[in-house]
Amino acid sequence: MSSRSRSRASSAARITDEQIGDLVSKLQALLPEARLRSNDRVPSARVLQETCSYIRSLHREVDDLSERLAELLAAADVSTAQAAVIRGLLM
């Protein structure tokens, strides 16, 4: 591959500041935090920090729900059809 071809391929793969801003804006729209939904300009770093915090909280919630479900299944009658269906879905 010539250096000209590499240069063209490299520039085609680069993302513009406008594209980054658009992606951050879309990411911000996915966050449940009301304070981030204001019309004020929120720095990209803040949006990324809030996104990471939100993902961590979702992981904790999944862990808590998994633990709760395991407790419920352990307490349920092993022979019940519902417990068997739930166990099958989790496997």
Swiss-Prot record:
Pfam families: bHLH_ILI
Keyword Transcription regulation tagged: yes
Residues covered by the bHLH domain: 4-58
One function term, GO molecular function aspect: protein dimerization activity
InterPro entries: bHLH_dom, HLH_DNA-bd_sf, PRE
Protein keywords: Growth regulation, Transcription, Transcription regulation
PROSITE patterns: BHLH
Family: Belongs to the bHLH protein family.
UniProt function note: Atypical and probable non DNA-binding bHLH transcription factor that integrates multiple signaling pathways to regulate cell elongation and plant development.
Name of the protein in question: Transcription factor ILI7
GN (gene name): ILI7
